[in-house]
Amino acid sequence: MKIIAVTGYKPFELGIFKQDEPALQYIKAELQKRLTALIEDGLEWVLISGQLGAEIWTAEVVFELQEEYPALKLAVITPFYDQEERWNEQNKELYEGILAQADFVESVTHRPYESPAQFKQKNRFFIEKTDGLLALYDPEHDGSPKYMIKEAENYTDYPIMYITMDDLRAQVEAEDPFFDEKQEKI
């Protein structure tokens, strides 16, 4: 796979409300592990739409990985112009920083938000232009990524790689073998 799309939960869907939330280190570590394996198999481009949560965290991981793998590129292709318009200032700053560092920035529809159809267009575009999808999503825990995943499932031979809650738990346990004992004391 040379080009992958990445999608996943928004921060509030995971109960994450701050950039310094401890859970983020484990999410980013799992993203880094998955992306590194794909890079070593020939990954060149990561596509995100710039949504808060898994996509922004992926961008941050890509920027870190570019230090070791400078050929890796990030594209931010939004569903419409000004998607950050209603975000708070902190999220806007984070988003604008991602756009400034991205290797390619574009919009699918070249106009402001008009209807949910623009999200469908974005999903279709991403799947048609990529070789696979990496999703921070657990089918047992519903959330916003389900729309992109449902679209991807309509395509024959389009690989979907999941990062599930079990994967994240394994990442936590790998980094902190005493995690379960600490949880029991709480």
UniProtKB/Swiss-Prot annotation:
Cited Pfam families: YpsA (PF06908)
SUPFAM superfamilies given in the database record: MCP/YpsA-like
Gene3D superfamilies attached to this UniProt entry: 3.40.50.450
Top-rank taxon, per record: Bacteria
Similarity remark: Belongs to the UPF0398 family.
PANTHER family documented for this protein: UPF0398 PROTEIN SPR0331 (PTHR38440:SF1), UPF0398 PROTEIN YPSA (PTHR38440)
Name assigned to this protein: UPF0398 protein BPUM_1952
Annotated organism of origin: Bacillus pumilus (strain SAFR-032)
